[in-house]
Amino acid sequence: MDPKLLDILVCPLCKSPLLYRKPENELICKADRLAFPIRDGIPIMLEDEARRLPVEEEISR
């Protein structure tokens, strides 16, 4: 994931910064507890495509 792109991307719902999880290839919104997938190098920033993170799943960084 391009670091410059990460600097400008925000959560489409709450506008919070996103964390990049390389192993899962996802962008994480800590505020909304959503994981947005990255497919073929393209972040899919649609709420319907996001995975809701369970409360017990730790979000680090």
Swiss-Prot record:
Similarity-based family: Belongs to the UPF0434 family.
Superkingdom of the organism of origin: Bacteria
Residue ranges of the TM segments: none
Record protein name field: UPF0434 protein Nmul_A1027
A Pfam family of this chain: Trm112p
Cellular component annotations (GO), alphabetically ordered: cytosol
